[in-house]
From Swiss-Prot:
Quaternary assembly: Monomer.
EC assignment: 6.1.1.5
Gene: ileS
GO terms under biological process: isoleucyl-tRNA aminoacylation
Alphabetical UniProt keywords: Aminoacyl-tRNA synthetase, ATP-binding, Cytoplasm, Ligase, Metal-binding, Nucleotide-binding, Protein biosynthesis, Zinc
SUPFAM superfamilies referenced in this protein's UniProt entry, alphabetically: Anticodon-binding domain of a subclass of class I aminoacyl-tRNA synthetases (SSF47323), Nucleotidylyl transferase (SSF52374), ValRS/IleRS/LeuRS editing domain (SSF50677)
Cofactor binding remark: Binds 1 zinc ion per subunit.
Gene3D superfamilies: 1.10.730.20, HUPs, Valyl/Leucyl/Isoleucyl-tRNA synthetase, editing domain
Cofactor: Zn(2+)
Annotated protein name in UniProt: Isoleucine--tRNA ligase
Cellular component, GO, one term: cytosol
Amino acid sequence: MSDYKHTLNLPETEFPMRGNLAQREPKMLQDWTNKALYHKIRAAKKGKTPFILHDGPPYANGDIHIGHAVNKILKDVIVKSKTLSDFDSPYVPGWDCHGLPIELMVEKKVGKPGKKVTAAEFRQKCRDYAEKQINGQKADFIRLGVLGEWDKPYRTMDFSSEANIIRELGNVVRSGHLEKGFKPVHWCTDCGSALAEAEVEYQDKVSPSIDVRFNIADEASFTKQFTAIGEGLGEGTISVVIWTTTPWTLPANRAVSLHPELEYSLVQVQSENGNERLVVATDLLDECVKRFGFENTHVLGTALGQALENMQVQHPFYDFTVPLILGEHVTTDSGTGCVHTAPGHGVEDFNVGRQYNLEVANPVGANGVYLENTPIFAGEHVFKANEHVVEVLAERGALVHHVKYTHSYPHCWRHKTPLIFRATPQWFISMDKNGLRAASIKEIHKTQWIPEWGESRIESMVAGRPDWCISRQRTWGVPIALFVHKDTGDLHPNTDALIEQVAQRVESEGIQAWWDIDPQEMLGDDADTFVKVLDTLDVWFDSGVSHYFVVDKRDDIPASADLYLEGSDQHRGWFMSSLMTSVATKGHAPYKQVLTHGFTVDGKGKKMSKSLGNTVAPQQVTNKLGADILRLWVASTDYRSEIAVSDEILKRSADAYRRIRNTSRFLLANLTGFNPKTDLVPFEEMVELDKWAVSRAHTMQREIVKAYEAYDLLVVTQKLMQFCSIEMGSFYLDIIKDRQYTAKSDSHARRSCQSALYHIVEALVRWMAPITSFTAQEIWQEMPWQEDEFVFTGTWYTGLTAQADNTEFNDAFWQQVLAVKDEVNRTIELARKEGTIGGSLEAEVKIYATAELAELLSKLQDEARFVFITSSATVEAVESKPADATETEVPGLWLHISASEGKKCARCWHHREDVGTNESHPELCQRCVTNVDGEGETRAYA
């Protein structure tokens, strides 16, 4: 038996079947670094239309987690896709470096500043710690295949950044949005500092729920305001009843608030105190009576809240009276409709108190302990004092009702401990003084939010948020570099110039310069009347002004930011702080689009935590499976909602990756010996099936690029998989194997096929590049005709051609053929299982079809057998179908499979009756004889 293997065009490539990504990727990264890939991209795109994705800085503390990996991969995919769309899209990664978490880590090592180390030494230790953390995180981000300005990132602790943060503070001052105030702020007693809105988490907390009597001081005057119902206005002490879940704030009570338009009822009740009269909102009366457990109650009279304004009530345990005041914040959602008001412990209380010039009492220290001059409760921690307050109320007959109550309560994001509202002298960016709130909302509406619900979410947050407290009482932070008058607290009249002088010092010496500056040196004679502010800036201000010191200031960023991309928690964090500072100083939003992704959860949808043991470390995934698997997983998810990850989910991504890799390998292996400069067949001269494949790639590229532009990576990966697995793997590539392997090596039939494969791999490698970056570059290196060294420096492939819809062999034609082929495959598989045939090349298929379908399939003529991968395929009228023909799911199509009576060709394995008709090649069919010794077969259709 002769060996015809040498006459076949067998696939050949050095591109391995197995990715071995964990071993191969680090070597590729080293090569990219050595060859300055990122800077080559920048050079290639210089002068192109800019697209700026501004990086929200991760915090420089700890190893990166899977959420960090998702965020950085998404950004990298988008930047690379924009680069392929021929934008100049630099990526400057950043880090957030100041603040409490780093202070706490350094405190563990060296103690608090001022004890074992000076404040200056402590700041340097913090800087050193952040530097080390950044280096670790940077290595992990680079390992993910993220390209960027890694040798020159932005860091909020860089001297230039610190200086520009101070300059932007000066711009806020100049725009008139900065205020100093004694206001209630979220305060963490563990941090000993105010917290920003973004640093507050809400968790369930069990608190005392109490209703408390405030006795009326002048009952005669009070009852005159009520319209009687029936005879008289009853008997017994009169009390206004308030409801609260923060008994510890009662020492600071300075009023009871009523709603001016609400009706209040004077109610006769019998209690443990005997006959008494209580005042509650009429709308809440039934609920209150039920809660209090009183019997024999009836309404004596009613009055509007506005009629009771300025009436005095007795504080429940201190020897002074407080007024009844009016406030629009009072509701009938719960409670009694009479609101305990402590201006030092609540924003609404503070605001309404200011209208009545109430004292802003603040009897609580920074550590959460009542001050020494606080009657009854001095020295007690507020949360421990709750029960003591309840006891005192009960002893004095002021307690109406008391139960335990579970409710959502603000907690410190770092310590996970309950917060208090505490009035302290702080610096604020005013939301309303100069119209910042309204201007910010206007800019929100000009921005594109993806998903769309982000717009209403951040709008409601901005609409309802308090003034932004930007001051902190910390050591490691950018200073609020202001001089204020000792007595009045007013800013120095030369503040603009002073801020610039400080910024210049900080630019060369870092933030320590502020604490080292002698006021005399800068202020001269004014040093006696003006003092330095020693507070530091909220770290959300640091990162929130990165639009100023990164996007506006850096030479390698050519324009304002097009896109911010972070987790959905950043609506109340970085998106908001960036918006407010940009609108305050520049009058517009810092971004054109804002895209958010969800949080990672485990395979069962549960939140990830170390305690549950369900975390997935990106480092372990890259070390085991490779970064491309992680990148493909990220792109394959609907990342705008929760993102599930588990070993099983990653395994599915690895399986999908193998299908893409195998398709790529087939393309490369069958381009051996092909030179596009000499062998490329023009589109119009190609075999019809090859035209279709190129045209499908053209359509697919249009859809994929559109999906990239919409940041819809799930659609990109779905299209990739559809193209590789179905349209190529199960159809086109399956069909062309015979022609590719058996046709004469330089024949038109084979060169047409190779030309299609060439166009397809040129397009496919670029579609893949933003997502499976390492594999795309690996493929690129196996394409010897490429002039560019890297796939990332070019653009989408422009050599694809679309087949016109009005042509005979258009996409609709081939889609119909594909549907018939699926039915043929299914029917052959049934025949194989029944033992009628072995493989498909042993089969003869007779296709019985209705007139229209039969006419369509007949266009393939004798080449239909190559499409169906059978030794024979004939098309006949449906009327002639035999009784044992198989009906299919394609309307009007029946199939009949039988074993071929022809002999098996030793070269192409088709069973043909003409095998052995050539004496020189008795084991070959006539087609193979032509391909071996003759001019080679011709193909027109497949």
